[in-house]
Amino acid sequence: MLSKLFRSRAPVAAPTLPAVPEGTVVWAVGDVHGRLDLLEPLIDAIMADLRDAAATRRVVVFLGDYIDRGPDSRGVIRRLAGLSQVQDIEWHFLKGNHEQAMLGFLQNPSTGPKWCEYGGDNALRSYGLRVPELAHRAEAWARVAADLRHILTEAEMDFLETLELSVSVGDYFFSHAGARPGVALNRQSPEDLMWIRQPFLDSAVGFERVVVHGHTPARTVQADSRRIGIDTKAYETGVLTGLRIQGRERSLLQSSGPQRGPGTRYGGEEYLPVDGEQGVVVRAARIDPQDPGVAVGG
C-alpha cells in the first residue's frame, strides 16, 4: 500500500535550451542611434559571417531606433534602406519609438519640440535642417516638417513607412522594446512593442519565446532565460552590439569606436576615442547557454 501511495518520481528532464531551426542563422542588431561609423563595420562583419555560414536561411533583424541622438541619422537610414537589395538574406527592420516619433512629426509638426527633447534635433541636423529657436512657434515647426518631407527620398520614406513591429524565428521573438507580461506574443500592442520598459523588465513572467530587444540602454548586454537586451547605448558608449543565433548557440559581436565625452552634445566632432584607440574595433564574445546572463570573451 505504501508503495502505491508514495510512488517514486520520474526524473525531471533538464530544461530545453531555446533554439532556431536547423540550417538557420539569425543576427540581431541593437539600437544604432545615428552611429553610421559603428554600423558599417558591424554590417561588414555580419555579411562576411553569413557568406561563410553553412545555412539555408540567413536572417538579419534590426531592432529599431536607427535615428536621433547620434551624429548621422540620415546616413544610417540611407544605408539600411539599401540593404534590401542584397539577395539571399531575409531582412527585417523593426520600428522603434524614435522612428515612430519622426513619422509622427511629419504628420503633426506640433510634436517637434517633444521629439527634439530626446534626440530629434540631431536627426534634423543630419538632414541639414535647423531646429526653430522658438519652440512654441507652430509655423516654424510646420516649415521644418515640410522641408524634411521634401528632403527624404522615396526610398527613405518607403523604408520608414514599412518598418515591422516584431518577428519570430524559432524560439525567439524580436521587438524593439520588449513585450507585456501576461499577454501572448501574437497579441501584443504596437505601443508596448515600441515603448514598454519597467513592466517588462521588472517582471519574472516568461513568454512563449525568448524576447530579444533594444530600447532600454545598458553598458553591457542583459541576458536571462526570458530576454536578451542588446541596446548598449551606442550613441554615447561607442559600442554597437550584434547577437548571432545558430541552433542553440548564441554569440555577440560588437563594433567599438569613439564615445561621447561627458557633458558634450551629440555632434560627431565631440566624440572621443575609446580606450585610446583610433577607428573602429570589432570584438566577439559568446553567451554561455548554461548561464545566459554571462557573456564570455572569445
Predicted regions and their residues:
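Short, glycine/acidic-enriched loop or turn micro-motifs at the edges of active sites
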Residues: 33-34, 68, 100, 179, ...
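Acidic, His/Gly-enriched loop-helix segments that form or flank divalent-metal centers
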Residues: 124-125, 129, 133-229, 233-239, ...
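Active-site neighborhood of phospho(di)ester-bond hydrolases with catalytic His/Asp-centered motifs
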Residues: 29-30, 61-64, 92-96, 210-216, ...
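Active-site neighborhood of divalent metal-dependent phosphoester bond hydrolases
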Residues: 56, 69-162, 196, 200-202
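A general structural motif
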Residues: 23, 55-57, 88-90, 170, ...
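Extended recognition/assembly regions associated with phosphoester-bond processing machinery
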Residues: 3-22, 41, 54, 161-165, ...
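Glycine-rich, phosphate-binding/catalytic loops in enzymes
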Residues: 45-46, 76-80, 109-112, 191-192, ...
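N-terminal active-site segment of His-dependent metallophosphoesterases
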Residues: 1-79
